[in-house]
Swiss-Prot record:
This protein's encoding gene: LECRK54
Knockout consequences: Increased susceptibility to the oomycetes Phytophthora brassicae and Phytophthora capsici and to the bacteria Pseudomonas syringae, characterized by stronger necrotic symptoms.
Name of the featured protein: L-type lectin-domain containing receptor kinase V.4
Lineage, highest ranks first: Eukaryota, Viridiplantae, Streptophyta, Embryophyta, Tracheophyta
Source organism (scientific name): Arabidopsis thaliana
GO MF, one example: protein serine kinase activity
UniProt-annotated binding residues for ATP: 340-348, 363
One annotated Gene Ontology cellular component of this protein: plasma membrane
């Protein structure tokens, strides 16, 4: 039991940070660490140099009750690209240290961890897993391509050639200096007092069952209660780029299931020859002269003829979506006269692209929008690269003077909020249409949270931001509040934004949006679509009905369908409607711990998973926070159709993830 609780405690702390930035802090870089072509590197093009990148906050490693190191797991992705394809520099290491960064460290064979004076000193309290690409006789290295476990010094107490064991148990070599992405997993078991290290290639379809290194030793004498974690690398007479893609730390010894895209890292930069430099300088001088002449002519003609000024800045080159000319949009919208509506960030106009019959919707960001540029950048950098059938497609953008424009596919049926509530002379949505809309938006959110290369938090899920196409398919739009994150990073943001009634309570308290706050808003969205009612309905001057609370009350009274509009409730849909209402209450629960993630929501709506029998007891329980700290995830109890599980009140209804 103490091991389980200890694992939970360290999990809750360590799960808060991953990759290079997180809610608690950042990787603090020292020495030659920096960035090259958008990738974090521990070393640059300098010889005999070292670089370090350490978390800026301490990590508790020990169970205070018995002063033993608790179980933990570390997974990180790296690549090493040396200037000589056949010869490495010195290498890199994952380091657990009592200090943030290691002062007085040396480069070359010491990997930026130790120096000649303190190498092997028992007072160091340093644990390292080295990825060594240089054979140093003084440390007993077996070759120039090996992995080792080091305690307080550079002489490895456990080592092996770099490689992995395939499914048949056969050893396969891996080159640490190939320049390709490699994965290292470090697992320590408190119970078995065993440290396992596995090296593998993310390109393989399986994860090795057998570790490369296995050290049977209690780490408690060497690791203090509070430590720092990070990475270090060094160069010698040969230089190399040591790339860090991402890293993850968790409590327990389970290997996280990580599905990342595999990038191609840039090779070591080649030095230019003297002749090349002379030609380059001469060419640049000539180009500069021509540019000056051209600029003078351009200014002259600009002042005489050009009336529309469109500035193409550096950030626009990297955004991806097509840039439209202002004149093109002006003509398409007939001078911005076909107004479709007005939202929190500007007006939306209908248009038809010149030379085609393609209809578009153009959003013009208002002049008085204080965060106009910020929201504009967020939207084009996010939705412009997303491709999903239930997301509104961004065709391109335009910037004219101080005005910002976004060009979308035109949705002829407008926004969903126009169809939800009973209005005179308006056809009501059938239950089948409502259920399909719910599943469409669930699929879109699952894509944003779990299936794209980066995690996207929408932050403003509501019927007004759901558009209906000509086939009555629902598409999620308005990414003006969206936030983008690398996979594996803690997806949180510090600015409270969104529509008030859809904002989760923890977002109001902490100001940090997560995938869980999106799930909360989606739960309310499900209730609003299913019931055909607004979230807040005023029955009398002094009587307001909160839809989520009322639905739960109807459920407690034994008839959850009482919350539904009469025209919907009387359709032949009782079981399906009851499922959606219960799932909506669950997703919009005040306690983050029992909300399912969107992948589970999609499976439940599709009939692949079922809700537990005692879900009402779980929703009503008051001690959810205590469950999340002491119990296993309840989603593991969710069973396939035909085998409904029963949950106890000591299990949280979520899995710890992004």
């Amino acid at each position: 039991m103490s091991r389980t609780i200890g694992s939970r405690v360290i999990f809750l702390i360590l799960a808060l940070f991953c990759c290079t930035e997180n809610s608690r802090g950042k990787l603090v870089m020292q020495g030659s660490a920096g960035f090259f072509k958008g990738y974090r590197t521990l070393t640059s093009t300098k010889k005999h140099a070292y670089g370090q990148a350490f978390e800026d906050e301490i990590v508790p490693f020990k169970n205070s009750a018995n002063d033993t190191v608790t179980s933990f797991s570390v997974t990180f992705f790296f690549a090493i690209a040396p200037e000589d394809k056949h010869k490495g520099a010195h290498g890199m290491a994952f380091v657990i240290s009592p200090t943030r960064g290691i002062t007085g460290a040396s480069a070359d064979q010491y990997l930026g961890i130790f120096n000649k004076a303190n190498n092997g000193d028992s007072s160091n309290h340093v644990i390292a897993v080295e990825l060594d690409i240089n054979k140093d006789e003084e440390f007993g290295d077996i070759n120039d391509n090996h992995v080792g476990i080091n305690i307080n010094g550079m002489r490895s107490i456990k080592f092996a050639p770099a490689g992995y064991y395939d499914q048949e148990g056969q050893f396969k070599d891996l080159s640490l200096i190939s320049g390709s992405l490699l994965r290292v997993t470090i697992l320590y078991s408190q119970m078995e007092k065993q440290l396992n290290v596995t090296l593998s290639s993310p390109e393989e379809a399986y994860y090795p069952n057998k570790p490369l290194l296995s050290l049977n030793q209690d780490l408690s004498p060497y690791i203090l209660e509070n430590m720092y974690v990070g990475f270090s690398a060094s160069t010698g007479s040969v230089r190399a780029m040591h790339y860090m893609l991402s890293w993850f730390v968790h409590g327990g010894v389970d290997v996280p299931n990580l599905d990342l895209g595999i990038p191609t890292f840039p090779p070591y930069p080649k030095e230019k020859s003297l002749v090349y430099r002379i030609v380059l300088v001469t060419s640049l001088a000539l180009v500069l002269f021509v540019a000056l002449v051209a600029s003078a002519l351009s200014i002259f003609f600009y002042r005489r003829h050009k009336k529309v000024k469109e500035v193409l800045e550096e950030w626009e080159i990297q955004c991806g979506p097509h840039r439209f000319a202002y004149k093109e949009l002006f003509k398409a919208t007939k001078g911005f006269k076909q107004l479709l509506g007005k939202g929190g960030f500007g007006q939306v106009f209908k248009g038809t692209l010149p030379g085609s019959d393609a209809e578009i919707a153009v959003k013009r960001i208002s002049h008085d929008s204080k965060q106009g540029m910020q929201e504009f950048l967020a939207e084009i950098s996010t939705i412009g690269r997303l491709r999903h059938q239930n997301l509104v497609r961004l065709q391109g953008y335009c910037r004219y003077k101080e005005e910002l424009y976004l060009v979308y596919d035109f949705m002829p049926n407008g926004s969903l909020d126009k169809y939800l509530y009973h209005r005179a002379n308006q056809e009501q949505l059938t239950w089948n249409q409502r259920f399909k809309i719910i599943k469409d938006i669930a699929s879109a959110l699952c894509y944003l949270h779990h299936e794209w290369v980066q995690v996207v938090i929408h932050r403003d899920i509501k019927p007004a931001n759901v558009l209906i196409d000509h086939q009555m398919n629902a598409r999620l739009g308005d990414f003006g509040l969206a936030k983008l994150y690398d996979q594996g990073y803690d997806p949180q943001t510090s600015r409270v934004a969104g529509t008030f009634w859809y904002i989760a309570p923890e977002l109001i308290r902490s100001g940090r949006a997560t995938t869980g706050t999106d799930v909360y808003a989606f739960g309310l969205f499900m209730l609003e679509v299913s019931c055909g009612r607004r979230l807040i309905e005023r029955r009398t001057a002094s009587d307001e009905v909160v839809l989520a609370e009322w639905t739960l009350k109807c459920w407690e009274n034994g008839d959850i369908l009482e919350a539904v509009n009469d025209g919907i409730r009387h359709e032949d849909n009782r079981e399906q409607l009851e499922l959606v209402l219960k799932l909506g209450v669950l997703c919009s629960h005040q306690a983050v711990a029992i909300r399912p993630d969107m992948s589970k929501v999609v499976q439940i709506l599709g009939g692949d998973l079922q809700l537990p029998d005692n879900l009402l007891d779980i929703v009503k329980a008051e001690k959810v926070r205590m469950w999340s700290e002491t119990s296993e995830s309840v989603l593991g109890v969710l069973t396939s159709q035909g085998s409904i599980g029963t949950l106890t009140l000591t299990e949280p209804f979520t899995s710890r993830g992004r």
